[in-house]
């Protein structure tokens, strides 16, 4: 007989999921000032995204995403967390 309890899987440990981290307020401020933009002008990620949920991201946060790249070694992008 199967158990009805659901297992929680940490998808952030999968090799194809890049590292996601929430920027501290001062880091986020420095980033948008350096880029000369408003946070909302960054590409968006929904708070309901599985990785955003797993790291506890809330609307208004900025997430730094670090991907491994065979060409550059590392590629860094940023996402603004929106409701949804």
Swiss-Prot record:
Subunit structure: Part of the 13-subunit RNA polymerase.
Gene3D superfamilies: RPB5-like RNA polymerase subunit
EC number: 2.7.7.6
One Pfam family named in its UniProt record: RNA_pol_Rpb5_C
SUPFAM superfamilies documented for this protein: RPB5-like RNA polymerase subunit (SSF55287)
PROSITE patterns for the chain: RNA_POL_H_23KD (PS01110)
Compartment annotation: Cytoplasm
Presence of the UniProt keyword Endoplasmic reticulum in the record: no
Source species of the chain: Sulfolobus acidocaldarius (strain ATCC 33909 / DSM 639 / JCM 8929 / NBRC 15157 / NCIMB 11770)
Keyword hit for Transcription: yes
Keyword annotations of the record: Cytoplasm, DNA-directed RNA polymerase, Nucleotidyltransferase, Transcription, Transferase
Disulfide bond entries: none
Enzyme class: transferase
Family: Belongs to the archaeal Rpo5/eukaryotic RPB5 RNA polymerase subunit family.
Biological processes, Gene Ontology terms: DNA-templated transcription; transcription by RNA polymerase II; transcription elongation by RNA polymerase I; tRNA transcription by RNA polymerase III
Gene: rpo5
Name by which UniProt lists this protein: DNA-directed RNA polymerase subunit Rpo5
Reactions that this protein is recorded to catalyse: RNA(n) + a ribonucleoside 5'-triphosphate = RNA(n+1) + diphosphate
GO molecular function ontology, one term from the record: DNA-directed RNA polymerase activity
Major localisation: cytoplasm
Record's function text: DNA-dependent RNA polymerase (RNAP) catalyzes the transcription of DNA into RNA using the four ribonucleoside triphosphates as substrates.
